[in-house]
UniProtKB/Swiss-Prot annotation:
Needed co-factor(s): heme
Protein name as it appears in the record: Cytochrome P450 monooxygenase bsc5
Binding residue positions for heme: C459
InterPro entries per the UniProt record, alphabetical: Cyt_P450, Cyt_P450_CS, Cyt_P450_E_grp-IV, Cyt_P450_sf
A cellular component annotation (GO) from this entry: membrane
Protein origin, superkingdom: Eukaryota
Localization of this protein: Membrane
Pathway: Mycotoxin biosynthesis
Annotated gene: bsc5
Function: Cytochrome P450 monooxygenase; part of the gene cluster that mediates the biosynthesis of the diterpene glucoside brassicicene C. In the first step of the brassicicene C biosynthesis, the bifunctional diterpene synthase bsc8 that possesses both prenyl transferase and terpene cyclase activity, converts isopentenyl diphosphate and dimethylallyl diphosphate into geranylgeranyl diphosphate (GGDP) that is further converted into fusicocca-2,10(14)-diene, the first precursor for brassicicene C.
Family: Belongs to the cytochrome P450 family.
Organism: Alternaria brassicicola (Dark leaf spot agent)
A GO MF term: heme binding
């Protein structure tokens, strides 16, 4: 018995020795596995900090909010200060250090595979946070999203011209009314609901486009998730993985995503069966389908979340477009001398050519006025957002380390060497093809007008947005008058690079007697 007891004791001691040996090896394993990664992070940080920064000196920026608050609240000033002395600067954003390049580098980046836009939105929009999955979907399924937009959505213009108009007409009646007396409306909320309904008509068909419950879920998700992202940017990055579990906007986003899932899954299953039968019978036509079918078709068996996919396109199609429309409406109140010429151009085109996509898309003055509105107040101060996939050396020997966040400043949109009187609104600026031939159309992109991005970073949905916003503007020009409420011109809210019209702004609208009825022109 004693022998057995000693043997058990020795076995226990041996196990303890083994455990201590393993514990002793842990630091070695830690250094071996994580050491190179930690070293690379440090090396990248050293190279990044060599790039000049316009921030105030703050040696405790890791634990204080000085530089982060400066970026969020004073980004425009930082950009002016930084580019006054160089073409490459570094800003301390809320989520990372960002290398900001002068517009002169846009041509170099437009097709450079060393810079990838895939993971930038995931990092900037906190795609890893539960409830914000649509922002990660843009990263993980970027090719699928681009194909759905460029190969399907952008090719449905002929039928879309009528059904978008019908959806917009219905939404306008609900949001702005038919009263000839002035009526106060919440500008951002009204425009968002109008554009959500019209976009969903193209993306999800008539059933969901006129479903008030679904429209409410979707618009709430867009507003709540964007608000949540903006709020989380104000926090130190290391706190986000914890705080989001308790943040009200993140919690609400998760609940809305669950409601969206319950609402959309039955429609997805139905469309999936219809697609299977149509392809089996050889009767499938992409132009007769919607985004449920397009995703399923182009995914070609690849795994994806159909609900997140729908919300991804919804956010992409409506958030920045809503801001543009709010700015356009504000500009038309500030510069009312363009209203009647725009109406005259539209009425003449409709009388001569009827209600067709080609008619709506060929309105030179409207293109120019929209382009000018976007030039003076784009949705962001920088575009072509990307992540360096390798160490990159710029022409002036500046090193951008691998995994660094990179963005191109859009300050050339107000450059006096490019535009005459750059701070003045000139609605006829782009109508002259000899002055700015590369920017005649609202959808055209260039180094000096990156309202939709540039190169491979350009927004693939801008052609659909062009049609949709012009249809909405046509209805507004013919059917409504609008002016500022007592609060006056809506303020511009900034958060880092983003600059949007105050979503709480109010506007007064009233119905007018149109010179020509759009509905009478439908073919």
């Amino acid at each position: 018995m004693l022998e057995g007891t000693l043997q058990d004791c020795w076995t226990s001691i041996s196990k303890m020795q083994l455990h201590w040996t393993v514990l002793g090896l842990l630091p070695v394993l830690f250094i071996a596995i994580l050491g190179p990664r930690v070293r690379q992070i440090w090396v990248n940080y050293v190279h990044l900090t060599k790039i000049p920064s316009p921030h105030k000196k703050d040696y405790f920026c890791f634990v204080t909010e000085t530089t982060r608050a400066e970026f969020l609240n004073e980004c425009a000033r930082l950009l002016r200060k930084g580019f006054a002395s160089g073409d490459v600067i570094r800003l301390h954003a809320s989520w990372d250090h960002i290398v900001v390049l002068s517009p002169s580098y846009a041509e170099c980046l437009r097709a450079d595979e060393k810079f990838s836009p895939d993971t930038f939105s995931d990092k900037e929009m906190f795609g890893a946070v539960p409830g914000f999955e649509p922002y990660r979907f843009l990263c993980t399924h970027r090719d699928l999203v681009r194909n759905v937009i460029s190969m399907r959505l952008n090719r449905c213009f002929v039928p879309a011209t009528r059904y978008l108009s019908e959806a917009i007409d219905d939404a306008l009646r609900k949001q702005m009314g038919n009263d000839s007396e002035w009526r106060e409306v919440p500008l951002g909320n009204a425009v968002l609901k109008i554009l959500t309904q019209s976009s969903f008509r193209a993306l999800q068909g008539p059933e969901l486009c006129y479903d008030d419950e679904w429209l409410d879920i979707a618009t709430q998700y867009i507003v709540t998730s964007v608000t949540g992202v903006t709020a989380l940017r104000k926090l130190p990055k290391f706190l986000v993985p914890l705080i989001h579990w308790f943040h009200p906007d993140a919690i609400k986003s998760r609940r809305l995503l669950s409601r969206a899932r319950a609402k959309l899954i039955p429609f997805y299953e139905k469309r999936k069966k219809e697609l299977y039968q149509a392809r089996r019978n050889g009767t499938y036509r992409p132009e007769d389908a919607d985004a449920f079918g397009w995703y399923e078709e182009l995914a070609d068996g690849r795994d994806y979340d159909p609900v997140v996919a729908q919300l991804t396109v919804a956010v992409a199609a409506t958030h920045s477009t809503t801001d543009f429309m709010c700015q356009f409406l504000s500009d038309m109140v500030r510069y009312p001398e363009y209203i009647q010429p725009l109406r005259d151009e539209l009425i003449l085109a409709l009388k001569e050519k009827g209600w067709k996509a080609s008619t709506i898309l060929q309105l030179p003055l409207l293109d120019s006025v929209m382009k000018e509105s976007q030039r003076l107040k784009p949705v962001a101060m920088g575009f072509m957002r990307s992540i360096a996939q390798h160490d990159v050396y710029l022409q002036d020997a500046v090193k951008i380390p691998k995994n660094a966040s990179v963005i191109v400043s859009a300050h050339s949109m107000r450059d006096a060497t490019v535009y005459e009187n750059p701070d003045s609104f000139d609605g006829y600026r782009f109508i002259n093809p000899t002055k700015h031939p590369e920017s005649r159309h609202f959808t055209s992109v260039s180094v000096n007008h990156m309202g939709f991005g540039f190169g491979k970073h350009a927004c693939p949905g801008r052609f659909f947005v062009n049609l949709e916003t012009k249809i909405l503007i046509a209805h507004l020009l013919l059917k409504y008058d609008w002016k500022f409420a007592n609060d006056g011109c809506p303020a511009i809210r900034t958060s880092g690079f983003d600059q949007v019209v105050d979503p709480s702004a109010k506007m007064l609208v009233r119905r007018r007697k149109e010179e020509i009825r759009i509905e009478a022109l439908y073919e």
